[in-house]
Amino acid sequence: MKFPTIKSKKDSLYITLFFLFSIACIAGLRYEQRLEMQKGIAEKIIRFHVIANSDTKEDQDLKLAVRDAVGIKMSGLLKDAADRSRSEAVIRKNMEDMKQTAEKVISERGYDYDVDICLTDTDFPVKTYGAYTFPAGNYEALEIVIGAGRGHNWWCVMYPNMCFSNTMYEVIDEDARSSLKRVLSEDEYQQVLASGDYQVKFKSFEILKGLYDEK
């Protein structure tokens, strides 16, 4: 591509400012688009969040044991839930049972920690599950807080099921992929089917470079 030659420093300044302004506008629009995309994704999924009492090995192991016990039960309860609304209703209906399940695991391991469990809106960082990267933002989640809740946490996507697979580990099987593709729009699905690298290459940089190269 042939670019016009910059004839003076004044021209150079004007052109630079123009392109910087254009880049800022494009970046702002893309940011707004990502926010809207995240909100759209959040409206269609439910996440699962377990917070340990502390970061000691014992408390972290306990967190995973609670995760497994609750996860196995919820996996069975949610397997026939047709949509997000139905999944939310099943979770709310079984909240007390899930709390008792967590308390039983804690007691059997010799601890007397309190357990708080709720379905709540929670801020999540960017999180990758296999090939899927979910943008940071606010999501509804089944949240379990063990004891003081000061330890590292664990999270996954509860609906559609992306974390319960027999042994409860994050194994994204074909059913999970199909379910996710079914509940998200094509644009939303392509958004999460990313590496997590959100860097944007603007054509403006190429144009600006070309202008200076031909000075």
Regions found by a protein language model. Give the residues of each.
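Soluble extracytoplasmic domains of inner/organellar membrane proteins
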Residues: 132-198
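Early exported N-terminus immediately downstream of N-terminal targeting peptides
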Residues: 44-95
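Glycine-rich, aromatic-bearing surface loops/beta-hairpins
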Residues: 1, 188-215
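Amphipathic, coiled-coil-like alpha-helical scaffolding segments used for oligomerization/assembly
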Residues: 84-125
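Soluble periplasmic/extracytoplasmic beta-strand elements of cell-envelope proteins
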Residues: 45-51, 114-118, 141-145, 155-157, ...
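Hydrophobic membrane-insertion alpha-helices, especially the h-region
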Residues: 13-28
